[in-house]
Amino acid sequence: MIAWTEASRAGLLGRAHWANNIVAGIIVGVVALPLSMAFAIATGVKPEQGIYTAIVASVIVAVAGGSRVQIAGPTGAFIAILSGITAKFGFDGLQIATLLAGIMLLFMGLFRFGGMIRFIAMPVIMGFTAGIGVVIFVGQWAAFFGLPKAGGEHFHQQLWSLLHSLPNLHPATAALGLFSLALLLLMPKVPLLRRLPSPMWVLLCATVLQSLFRFEGVATVGSAYGAIPRTLPHFSLPAFSAAQTVQLILPAFTVAMLGAIESLLSAVVADGMAGTRHSANQELVGQGLANIITPFFGGFAATGAIARTATNIRQGGNSPLAGVVHALTLALILLAAAPLAADIPLAALAAILFQVAWNMSEPKRCIRILRRAPRAAVVLFFITFFLTILADLVVAVNIGVIVSTLHFIGQMAKAVEVRKEEHSRDAAALPDNVLMFIVNGPFFFGAMEKFETTLADINTQPRTVVLRLRWVSYIDITGILTLERVIGSLQKRGIRVIVTGANEQVRASLERSGIITLLGEGNFIREFDDAAAMLRAEDKAATAS
């Protein structure tokens, strides 16, 4: 409850701030209504379940999250993975996956993994986000044009099926869809209409047209899903199955990762707009609790929503009160106007999702960044992008993270320098029968081949080899085992090994692993100058004798 507590300490829950937060919460609630319904339908569930998700999740995240201006609810980022779960396991499976994802998010927050999410490479995030946008866009063609549901299990099969059926589009449905899309695009460009929540107005206009003219054959919320019940979310237990739960662990992990990424990105955007500072770990705790509790009230996966959070800030929201009011607004609309939703054309909701898909994909930004990005980043983007489209999001995220990690390890290994020092002032301070090797960078598994190859090139028989670790910031278990092996090999050849310059962390690792004992007394020396002086003294004594 960091956000709520900080807002209280800052006086933002006082009466002086009530008006701003109440107004912001009402406006965000109006904006969230069509989005929540659209995301639910795209996920393959009933529209009211999207509203339930927004109501329950937003209250929990407002109270227990780490950002005092965050607005939570269903988002477009989840559509690709959640629709697949719904198609395969049904709504009960979707609820179980949400619950599992919530538990994972909760533990991520409790074990302070919030800071680690930012280590996921940006090309991976951009790639799967753009891919999700394309999947959403194509997935709404049937509703937008009045086409039969696309056949085929995979994206390319569905795309081919939709392209073949385009000549059979339903004229009235397509006209309503195009009208809705045009209104969405034009409203922000008209000064008088710019501040109005365009998705809500599009929904109202399209619904009024359908109510007045009753276009034959136009699919509506009522014809597809029946009447939306005029009831608030109530407690109910999802149907649990042990076998199904095991199958849902991997998809749930993907949901958790997506939720963590989007909620923390939203919190960062909010900090930039509002001048606040969020707690990443507490935000994950709040998101985890929201996803654990929401399935028990008829909802599904939720996360911080960037667009709704930004709207909250622009309208003057500065405390968690706005998030609570947003939930109350949705609840009141549900109680007062649920029957009116029956005439909402699905084509209008599809138009809203077209805009969501475009905003998620950010084509202009992607092109601009990819033009300047290194080749490896471009390749990583397209790997994740095409896997998201052609395989699925689970595969895309996992392979994207693995490939980016391997690339990073390769780059780090290249950056590690292992060299024989012969012509520097420090090398000149050593006796002639002493060789010095310098390691610069993390002493980890990726650099061990370079280390062993460099030291294997010792084709003389020096009396002593000095390993200078002054610039080694970290040593892992592979580095320790390799160092142990190399030291043992040199000692078998009668070559003394001295290690110098290790920092406290590296020294502690060497001591725990027994490397310092293996070196022998007096062969681990903190300062290089002390080692050089000792070797010169020993050489002088040997020469004198």
Positions of the model-derived regions?
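Transmembrane helical cores of multi-pass ion-transport proteins
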Residues: M1-R419, T482
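Structured cytosolic domains appended to multi-pass membrane proteins
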Residues: K420-S545
